[in-house]
């Protein structure tokens, strides 16, 4: 039985559209890497774009409502929502770095970026729970 590769695990996480499932997948990839369950092989390409949920529609910042300074409940909810989006994108960025450049770098580089992805996944949970 061949060991799953770090590249295939990263690719699967990047192709996960649901934000909470992606956060869990990032934590699982990092855990599997730490425990030696993933081979240091880059046998599948990183997707050109990570998967995104169908809704909500992503809009450019200039088309989004102003968040205010967090004084009102509505403003605080908007702020938590924005933070959740930032964490979601940060998961993808860290996974992409590990998958796209890991073969040219080393295991420490991959481990560092998988750790970042897991940390962002952990941070996504409370932010996502607030939105």
Walk through the language-model features, giving the residues of each.
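Non-heme di-metal
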Residues: 1-131
